[in-house]
From Swiss-Prot:
Name by which UniProt lists this protein: Trigger factor
Origin species: Clostridium beijerinckii (strain ATCC 51743 / NCIMB 8052)
Reported function: Involved in protein export. Acts as a chaperone by maintaining the newly synthesized protein in an open conformation. Functions as a peptidyl-prolyl cis-trans isomerase.
EC number: 5.2.1.8
InterPro entries per record: PPIase_dom_sf, PPIase_FKBP_dom, Trig_fac, Trigger_fac_C, Trigger_fac_C_sf, Trigger_fac_ribosome-bd_bac, Trigger_fac_ribosome-bd_sf, Trigger_fact/SurA_dom_sf
A GO cellular component entry from the record: cytoplasm
Domain called PPIase FKBP-type: residue spans: 163-248
BP GO terms, sorted: 'de novo' cotranslational protein folding; cell division; chaperone-mediated protein folding; protein transport; protein unfolding
Amino acid sequence: MKAKVEKIETNVIKLEIRVEAEKFDAALTKAYNKNKGRYNIPGFRKGKVPMAMVKKFYGVEVFYDDAVNFAIDESYPEALNAENIKPVDYPQVDIVELGEGKELVYTATVTTYPEVELGEYKGLDIKKPIYEVEDTEIDKQIKEMQEKNARIEVKTEGNIAKGDIAVIDFKGYIDGVAFEGGEGSDYSLEIGSGTFIDNFEEQLIGLAVGDKKEVNVTFPEAYGKEELNGKPAMFEVEIKSIKVKELPELDDEFAKDVSAVDTFAELKENLKKTLEKNNDEKAEREFEEAVITAVIENSKMDIPEVMVNKEIDAMMQDLEGRLKYQGLSLEQYMEFTGNTTEKMRDFMKENAERKVKADLVLEAIAKTEEIKATEEELNARALELGKIYGPKDPEKMAKILVKSQRNMIEKDIILENTLKFLKENCK
């Protein structure tokens, strides 16, 4: 095999590959052996027709498709390795010359991984932010727990006030015509929750059980349904009943009811620790994002469009998997959100470009700094994944993953170790 490299454009090269006549003839024989059971020639049993007779009867060209595939499957990776080329995607192959007893000559045009010119990446002036837990955050959490554990009682006297729950029947009209999805019965609406359109709930304050009222509102411009966006609407509303929330006392008994602790003081302390942990995780994410942004901005690279598209493909597959877990198809999700595949891919493009750039820069730094994944790290990560994908026998699944997904797991660990290296080397 001989290969000649021609640069077509940035990150695109054309390989001219020559496969020796002897090797192509061997590929022709391999093609014959693969297909000999398909040929029917009078006087020969099926599968026993000699190659020479098949060539005479059908022509040697009958073997070309498979023979070319066999020859390319062997010679293309060999050429990539010889020329130290790392392709991004499958090549565009064009046959230049072929024939029995002749060289197979073909070209393979392929997009390659871009070269990354690293800038400053050590000693970055970036610090991890610090977020203190405020008392108001703890109070908010406790208030939410109190609301969730409230008793709902029928309000026997008085009219609707803010914070009450109005049980209503309603029907909406636009220009005097009822619209789809604008009707409900025995709907429990907490006044002041902001559940309905702006100014809807406020117009119910002061009403009593049995009252009927025409409520006039305007749908937001970006409501999400074209036929309703920005439209004025009138709702016929009837008050069926009024309910109130009876909030539990914030004491030790409350703490026992909503958690595994015995005192209200312990409950507050646990909430504080949880918020501190959340704040630290948030700070760590922001720190990492700032470091990645800096090393990307300090580096130079031209990323091929195909790499971005492949990353978008992966993001779409991930979304589809998460939706499936929730019992939704991608088509249903797009219908609910008014999206199309093109809109979603456009929306994902910026994040996909950043992900590609981040991976390329981190890989380049890892190569420069000789950052590796140890066998211990690899096995530990495989075991973590084994517990997720093979909970009945995680150790067996871990061994399978080490064999089948080694490169992917190793890459993830190297990128994580590289990011850790960058953070440790910040000022």
